[in-house]
């Protein structure tokens, strides 16, 4: 699954994590400020699309390119791989675009406060605000949104090619060793379907995880700052950094709840694919052999399919009750925390909108597992099938892939 696309996967991912950690620590610990002072960057980032080509952002772009370039150069020399440009540089590009789209969210959040304060001023003091001011603020938002739309579309196009290259790498790897694998139940489905589903699902999960981490890095300091405007929480009362603590506790409660109620789902999904594969294989044999796929055999196999599906439906029923109930309460949880401050009149409409947006971003990042649980169940099921598939190759000499396909 990984060795077909990445060079020495275990070492590669460990080195990528360590190198990324070093780069982030250097930048956050003062390296970014040091570079900004040398280059004369002001640190004042405009609340508009111009922020994305301001000197501060251009410095970070250059820093990212240097870090990725050094890492890629090392791996190109240390362990050349047929798919190295897609697996290393392609992954780095996806990570960069994910960060960029998070920064778009930061820009929109910065725009919320002045825009909604402008609305509050207009509603409370007639004719004090001109319509041109509203047009100007909407123009600022549209400028940011246009960049986000263009980048998102281009990123989706690139990711589609990235996923197909990964699928191609796995397909080549398995087909090079097909004679060892062809006798395994459902081997054709593993190569034809599961490689595609694994690459696309893991890529989506990976991007979502990176997005959650970068969202926390970008929005958590903002939430810490905004917590000063909300000194009291309902029921609890006064608590420092209450919004941050509430986001963490609420997200952990939801994650723990779904982990408990959904613990059986991955195993059932895995078993479901096995009984489906057995049923499908018997039908395929029956197309060419009249002695196969007889009614008693088919009834027995389909009975196993029905039994497993009914068990799956039952377990998903109480899982979805817990998940949907939690998410419905979650929709109003952020606003519920602001009730004391709203009643006391200590926050404006713009500040309230900004706080609820930032709180939602941080809470959503902490709720990564909650939002991805059903996808995670599917991914674990696919991984189990492919891993059991690859056990046939463990300990055997793997045939090298010599042909090319790009």
From Swiss-Prot:
GO MF assignments: ATP binding; microcin transmembrane transporter activity; peptide transmembrane transporter activity; protein homodimerization activity; secondary active transmembrane transporter activity
Keyword Glycoprotein belongs to the record: no
A Pfam entry, by short name: SbmA_BacA
Phenotype caused by lack of the gene: Mutants are resistant to proline-rich antimicrobial peptides of eukaryotic origin.
Keyword tags: Cell inner membrane, Cell membrane, Membrane, Peptide transport, Protein transport, Transmembrane, Transmembrane helix, Transport
Record's bilayer topology term: Multi-pass membrane protein
GO CC annotation: plasma membrane
Locations listed in the record: Cell inner membrane
Residue ranges that the UniProt entry lists as topological domain Cytoplasmic: 33-56, 109-137, 227-242, 353-406
Transmembrane segments: 12-32, 57-77, 88-108, 138-158, 206-226, 243-263, 332-352
GO term, biological process aspect, one: microcin transport
Periplasmic side of membrane: 1-11, 78-87, 159-205, 264-331
Family annotation (InterPro entries): ABC1_TM_sf, ABC_transporter_sub-D, SbmA_BacA
NCBIfam families the record matches: PRK11098.1, PRK12369.1
Record's function text: Uptake of antimicrobial peptides. Required for the transport of microcin B17 (MccB17), microcin 25 (Mcc25) and proline-rich antimicrobial peptides (such as Cathelicidin-3, Arasin 1 and Dro/Drosocin) into the cell.
Family classification: Belongs to the peptide uptake permease (PUP) (TC 9.A.18) family.
Protein's name in the database: Peptide antibiotic transporter SbmA
Organism expressing this protein natively: Escherichia coli (strain K12)
Name of the gene: sbmA
């Amino acid at each position: 699954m990984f060795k077909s696309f990445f060079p020495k996967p275990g070492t590669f991912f460990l080195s990528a994590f360590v190198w990324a950690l070093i780069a982030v620590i250097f930048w956050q610990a003062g390296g970014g400020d040091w570079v900004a002072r040398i280059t004369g960057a002001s640190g004042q980032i405009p609340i508009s699309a111009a922020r994305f080509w301001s000197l501060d952002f251009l410095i970070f772009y250059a820093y990212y390119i240097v870090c990725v370039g050094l890492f890629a150069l090392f791996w190109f020399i240390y362990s050349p791989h047929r798919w190295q440009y897609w697996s290393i540089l392609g992954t780095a590009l996806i990570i960069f675009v994910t960060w960029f789209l998070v920064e778009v969210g930061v820009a929109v959040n910065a725009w919320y406060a002045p825009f909604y304060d402008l609305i509050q001023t207009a509603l409370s003091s007639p004719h004090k605000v001109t319509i041109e001011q509203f047009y100007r603020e909407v123009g600022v938002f549209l400028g940011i949104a246009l960049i986000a739309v263009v980048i998102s579309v281009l990123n989706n196009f690139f990711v589609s090619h990235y996923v197909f290259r990964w699928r191609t790498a796995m397909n080549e790897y398995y087909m090079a060793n097909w004679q060892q694998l062809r006798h395994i139940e459902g081997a054709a489905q593993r190569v034809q379907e599961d490689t595609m589903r694994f690459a696309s699902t893991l890529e989506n999960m990976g991007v979502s995880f990176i997005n959650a981490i970068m969202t926390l890095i970008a929005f958590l300091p903002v939430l810490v700052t905004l917590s000063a405007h909300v000194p009291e929480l309902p029921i609890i009362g006064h608590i420092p950094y209450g919004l941050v603590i509430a986001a963490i506790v609420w997200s952990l409660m939801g994650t723990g709840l779904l982990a408990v109620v959904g613990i059986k789902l991955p195993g059932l999904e895995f078993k479901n694919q096995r009984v489906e594969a057995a049923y499908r294989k018997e039908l395929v044999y029956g197309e060419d052999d009249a002695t196969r796929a007889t009614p008693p055999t088919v009834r027995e196999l389909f009975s196993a399919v029905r039994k497993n599906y009914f068990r799956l439906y039952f377990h998903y029923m109480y899982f979805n009750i817990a998940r949907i109930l939690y998410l419905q309460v979650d929709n109003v949880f952020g606003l519920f925390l602001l009730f004391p401050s709203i009643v006391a009149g200590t926050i404006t409409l713009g500040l309230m909108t900004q706080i609820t947006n930032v709180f939602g971003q941080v809470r959503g990042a902490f709720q990564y597992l909650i939002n991805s649980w059903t996808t995670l169940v599917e991914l674990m099921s696919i991984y189990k099938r492919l891993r059991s598939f690859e056990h046939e190759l463990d300990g055997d000499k793997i045939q090298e892939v010599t042909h090319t396909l790009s």
